[in-house]
Amino acid sequence: MNKVLLQLLFLITFLAITSQAAVVDTVDTYSAAMKKNIKAVVIRPDNYASAGEMPVVYLLHGYSGNYADWVKRAPGFEKAADTFQMMIVCPDGGFGSWYWDTKDPQFQYETYVSKELVSFIDSKYKTIKDRRGRAITGLSMGGHGGLYLAFRHQDVFGAAGSMSGGVDIRPFPNNWDMAKRLGKYSENAKVWEENTVINMVHLLTPNTLSIIIDCGKEDFFFGVNENLHRELMYRNIPHDYIVRPGAHNWPYWNNAVQYQLLFMNNFFSRKEAPVK
């Protein structure tokens, strides 16, 4: 009899644990700046209905990707929503927007992510509606985007991250549609200089923004990430900097995103987040 009871208790416990699963939805958002609907994946913890206001991590995709990349190519990462009691939002950032606002009215992704999307999420979900409850990160183009948007909108985001980010665009003038967005570097050097992350460190003061940067040693963006790390050190800007063996690929990002979300959770868990 005791053996049967033990087996029953084990089964109940197992079912209770395995029944917890983050809720993954695809929603339509609207950008007034670009006059179009844009899809986003919204991940909520299993107990969202009974929970209070919770923090949000905005997780950006890379060049040629879309809103579904993280869910499809990093299976299991969404469990962090349950583990850390947070929401994760994966917006569509266009094929090659680099998350800039440009002269092209169809590429206003800085406005979309930092203003329109944040407003949409705050209006539809139980979120902490200030920078203490918002973080942003991403991979490659999205790593650039995470830092670019957070550096420029420190009133919106309290923490920022980058995985394999293109944090200095200038060495790559002919790659990844950047010239389509900014014009040719040879003819528009000033625009390029003003829109590369490494030239925006002057916007930071120590302890105003929590920052984590991660890049594999075999990544073609490793050199520019090293340079950004040195610039942050020179300016005494606290940040976490992770270098591991690895290249510019999904096996690396599947691992890296776990560290990013842990870092963001630690930021959210502070009694008082840094304020500008």
Say what each PLM segment does.
Residues 1-7:
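Positively charged n-region of N-terminal signal peptides that target proteins for export
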